[in-house]
């Protein structure tokens, strides 16, 4: 991301298709900042333990918005998790950071099947310049990537403008 500003609120929307009926139980999603810290959005438990993805075995996330201000925890949701959910860890951990740099979505897949994932970061900053990425609008920095096998997949967004994160929300679509 090349825009300047300090994060005051960050959300992320994710669309993910695992390609496997019970695929979510094999996935863990983390957002990594350009400054080395990360937030876990949600995790699977291939042994059937809970909590994970609302205890659901569904394989996909559709227009799933990870937002600290949501009243529903991701683990209390139901597949395909459309709409806003609180992530496993707080996105406010990014508050006060600069928005500028390369953001990565880390997908850990432990079952060997592939899929696709795309994400869009929606951020509010304390910058005096207008926010080019208003919540749930268009024009957000986003990325899409396919994953396969038992591997880790990174999706990166480059933000080059200076600024500090004050709130971070993430939308993930697993398709």
For the regions a protein language model found, what residue spans apply to each?
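Loop and turn regions of beta-sandwich accessory domains that flank beta-strands and are enriched
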Residues: 1-175
